[in-house]
């Protein structure tokens, strides 16, 4: 409201100055002749009114643009009403939907019940507090860690290595009742090295958090031990949580544990770790029978509700159990509606029954995995089969449920003008999505999610429909989806403030179309029914991309949102493209034509046109068909993007290669532009962008442009490496160059699995269809596939992680880890599923 008032006052002031000038001119004209002065005054009055209305009209349009940017799209949801509720989808209601913590579960709800695990090794470093582990971090020294098995639904087993400890976290869900069923955890702590003479003293912290008016009632046992926690929420009904006494691993023999408890108001989800740390300040003695006592730091030990907060703030209840490794502890959630009418003693999912359930689920996972991907049948080694299982499990175990409001800068239609506005809150929305990395990117990314779902849909098409439906639910009234979804306090706490805001003028590669293509080709009734519901939103999303990112000439496209040409940047980044620092035109301008975006739009027009025809959407088909035909017409791409002097496709823009970073004390490294100066030309940056017509299979097998692209791809001076295709030619001036003094190369030579997957899919295609390059494509396919699979396997065996990217020089994993987002595509590469 205040911003609108200032604009109105500014518009009024701008309208007053021409009026004063008009009056002055009228007086001068009046001395020459009254009639002429009257006529001139009238004419000027008309001009003034027109100007005022013009300014007013622009303000109204800007105001409407802001409103549309912050308004959800009116099209019907692609998912059924209340699709996340236990009544509609009970099998998905509970899950490991907290990817940023080492182990935890929550309900798929805006106000969830959350459970989680923290742990600490007591006395590991005398005189210092124990290191409390909770959230996945890059630099906390924990690792490797990750899911050995996870079926995305009801079962998982994870191993975590932390110094001298190995933790195994397992869970099983059991259906029943009306509120999502029951679940049981088993956490096993063992020394990493066998035959360890001294077993470490370890504390586990099991906690429950509510987020509002929900009820938690702990039942007190002896010496700080909770018998159980009773609770009630509107979505779960009545329930009970029980922490069983610790036992020897693989046995039912009980072990002596020491107990502490803490109960408080919910401090806010990002502050749970800090609250436990701050209260872990009292010394206690662990006294097993027949053994010497050992000191440990514990929680206060009382069951009074500490630091009671405002009504509706929620509760935070922690049970600490401390003992010497090795041991196992089980934590059980029982739904009241599932328990009704059941013999609790015989039916509780604990002990031997839990062991049998875990073994049964593990066997079922392995059998289903082989049935789905057939790695053993296709001759892959046991190590490669295990890698495939880990890749799938890590991706499924990283699926999260998020709810909240993002920060958005509306699109005013004038580039750069959004910098003068304050961001606004988008409406509260849910998101069910995979994440690229639990430690570094534990939230939804639009460009990544399409690749994630290529893997997920082979395993569980229902999960993919849920994820795509949620992403399409983020559409604003214009058809825009923010490229990074930072929803809720937990997600926001892990992102620097300068990266929280999403700009409604900026796009992202429409990779959600990739799983849509698979759905369209498979023609499963459930998928086609989903696509019918989703089509209005898919169409709106594509239309926004096609219109908002239009380039300077017909059928050209340009990523909005390139960085400004600051003196510290070697080459202004293009974050919306997903390829961040990949070299583009040295001097950003409205004259740019971006090859990769043109290819994405061509693919989108093709897919949406085919989908409209399949669904009988005649009006949309009449619009999309001609657009697809124009974009795919012979010579259309050549005319805008073929660079004869480079022998490949390329971006076009205001460019010179005579740029470099030089030291200029005291500023540090600054960009220096030499000669020749920038001019409109094709951009000489040979790399992933150059391959996009090949990657997205937009070229006919007989195209004269296919051969040169295959030659460049196969040339070790350019893109070929023993570990996969590098992102930028080794001959490029930008190869492995920093973009700023503090910004190391990212898409400037490293090997990325998502693009290598697209390349393998294209080579597989062109190696199977008749054409002059069939033999060459097939040979390159076999060699590239072997290189990629071998390197990812070797790096996993050496480090225990899948990585964000891999070195083109020695194959080592680089970037963040674990990265079981699109690096999980190694599974589809092994299975030859494209």
Curated annotation (Swiss-Prot):
InterPro entries to which the protein is assigned, alphabetical: 6-hairpin_glycosidase_sf (IPR008928), 6hp_glycosidase-like_sf (IPR012341), Glyco_hydro_63_C (IPR031335), Glyco_hydro_63N (IPR031631), Glyco_hydro_63N_sf (IPR038518), Glycoside_hydrolase_63 (IPR004888)
Keyword terms, alphabetized: Endoplasmic reticulum, Glycoprotein, Glycosidase, Hydrolase, Membrane, Signal-anchor, Transmembrane, Transmembrane helix
EC number, UniProt record: 3.2.1.106
Name listed for the protein in its UniProt record: Mannosyl-oligosaccharide glucosidase
Similarity-based family: Belongs to the glycosyl hydrolase 63 family.
Localisation: Endoplasmic reticulum membrane
Extent of Basic and acidic residues compositional bias: 17-31
Membrane topology, record value: Single-pass type II membrane protein
Species: Rattus norvegicus
Positions annotated with a glycan in the UniProt record: 654
């Amino acid at each position: 409201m205040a911003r609108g008032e200032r604009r109105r006052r500014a518009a009024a002031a701008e309208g007053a100055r021409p009026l004063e000038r008009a009056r002055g001119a009228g007086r001068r004209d009046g001395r020459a002749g009254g009639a002429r002065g009257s006529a001139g005054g009238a004419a000027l009055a008309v001009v003034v009114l027109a100007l005022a209305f013009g300014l007013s009209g622009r303000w109204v349009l800007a105001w409407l643009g802001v409103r549309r940017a912050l308004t959800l799209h009116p099209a019907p949801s692609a998912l059924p009403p209340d699709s996340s509720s236990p009544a509609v989808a009970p099998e998905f209601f509970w899950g490991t939907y907290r990817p940023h913590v080492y182990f935890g579960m929550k309900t798929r709800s805006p106000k969830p019940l959350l459970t989680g695990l923290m742990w600490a090794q007591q006395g590991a470093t005398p005189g210092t507090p124990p290191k409390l582990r909770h959230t996945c971090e890059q630099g906390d020294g924990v690792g490797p860690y990750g899911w050995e098995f996870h079926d995305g639904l009801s079962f998982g087993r994870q191993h975590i290595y932390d110094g001298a400890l190995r933790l195994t976290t397992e869970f099983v869900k059991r259906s029943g009742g009306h509120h999502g069923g029951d679940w049981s955890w088993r956490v096993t702590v063992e020394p990493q090295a066998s035959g360890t003479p001294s077993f470490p003293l370890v504390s586990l912290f099991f906690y429950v958090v509510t987020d509002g008016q929900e009820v938690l009632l702990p039942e007190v046992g002896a010496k700080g031990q909770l018998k159980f926690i009773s609770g009630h929420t509107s979505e779960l009904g009545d329930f009970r949580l029980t922490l069983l006494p610790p036992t020897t691993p693989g046995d039912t023999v009980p072990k002596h544990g020491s107990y502490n408890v803490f109960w408080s108001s919910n401090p806010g989800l990002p502050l749970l770790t800090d609250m436990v740390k701050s209260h872990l300040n009292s010394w206690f003695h662990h006294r097993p029978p027949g053994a010497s006592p050992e000191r440990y730091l514990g929680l206060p030990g009382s069951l009074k509700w500490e630091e009671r907060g405002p009504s509706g703030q929620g509760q935070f209840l922690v049970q600490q159990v401390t003992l010497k490794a090795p041991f196992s502890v089980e934590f059980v959630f029982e739904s009241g509606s599932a328990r009704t009418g059941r013999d609790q003693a015989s039916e509780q999912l604990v002990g031997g029954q839990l062991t049998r359930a875990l073994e049964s689920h593990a066997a079922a996972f392995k059998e289903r995995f082989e049935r789905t991907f057939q790695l053993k049948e296709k001759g892959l080694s046991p190590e490669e089969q295990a890698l495939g299982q880990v890749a799938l499990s890590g991706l499924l175990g990283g699926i999260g449920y998020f709810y909240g409001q993002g920060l958005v800068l509306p699109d005013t239609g004038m580039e750069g003008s959004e910098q003068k506005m304050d961001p606004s809150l988008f409406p509260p929305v849910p998101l069910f999505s995979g994440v690229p990395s639990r430690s570094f990117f534990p939230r939804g990314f639009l460009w990544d999610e399409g690749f994630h779902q290529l893997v997920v849909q082979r395993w569980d098409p229902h999960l993919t429909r849920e994820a795509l439906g949620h992403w399409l639910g983020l559409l604003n009234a214009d058809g825009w989806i923010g490229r990074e979804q930072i929803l809720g306090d937990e997600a926001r706490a892990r992102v620097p403030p300068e990266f929280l805001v999403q700009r409604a003028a900026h796009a992202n590669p429409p990779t959600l179309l990739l799983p849509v293509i698979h759905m369209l080709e498979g023609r499963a009734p459930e998928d086609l029914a989903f696509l019918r519901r989703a089509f209005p939103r898919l169409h709106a999303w594509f239309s926004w991309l096609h219109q908002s990112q239009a380039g300077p000439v017909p059928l050209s496209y340009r990523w909005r949102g390139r960085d400004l040409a600051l003196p510290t940047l070697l080459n202004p980044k293009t974050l919306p493209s997903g390829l961040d620092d990949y070299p583009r035109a040295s001097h950003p301008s409205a004259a740019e034509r971006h090859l990769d975006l043109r290819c994405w739009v061509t693919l989108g027009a093709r897919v949406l046109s085919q989908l409209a025809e399949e669904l009988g959407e005649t009006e949309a088909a009449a619009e999309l068909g001609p657009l697809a035909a124009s974009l795919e017409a012979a010579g259309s791409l050549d005319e805008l993007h073929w660079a004869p002097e480079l022998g490949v496709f390329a971006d076009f823009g205001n460019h010179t290669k005579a740029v470099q970073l030089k030291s200029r004390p005291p500023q540090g490294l600054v960009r220096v532009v030499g000669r020749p100066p920038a001019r409109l030309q094709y951009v000489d940056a040979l790399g992933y962008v150059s391959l996009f017509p090949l990657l997205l299979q937009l070229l006919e097998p007989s195209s004269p442009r296919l051969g040169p692209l295959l030659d460049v791809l196969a040339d070790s001076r350019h893109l070929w490496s023993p570990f996969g295709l590098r992102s930028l030619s080794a001959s490029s001036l930008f190869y492995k160059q920093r973009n700023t003094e503090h910004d190391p190369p990212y898409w400037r030579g490293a090997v990325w699995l998502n693009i290598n997957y697209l390349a393998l899919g294209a080579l597989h295609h062109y190696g199977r269809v008749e054409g002059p390059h069939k033999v060459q494509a097939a040979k390159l396919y076999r060699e590239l596939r072997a290189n990629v699979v071998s390197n990812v396997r070797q790096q996993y065996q050496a480090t225990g992680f899948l990585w964000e990217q891999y070195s083109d020089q020695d194959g080592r994993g680089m970037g963040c880890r674990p990265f079981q987002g699109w690096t999980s595509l190694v599974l589809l590469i092994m299975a030859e599923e494209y």
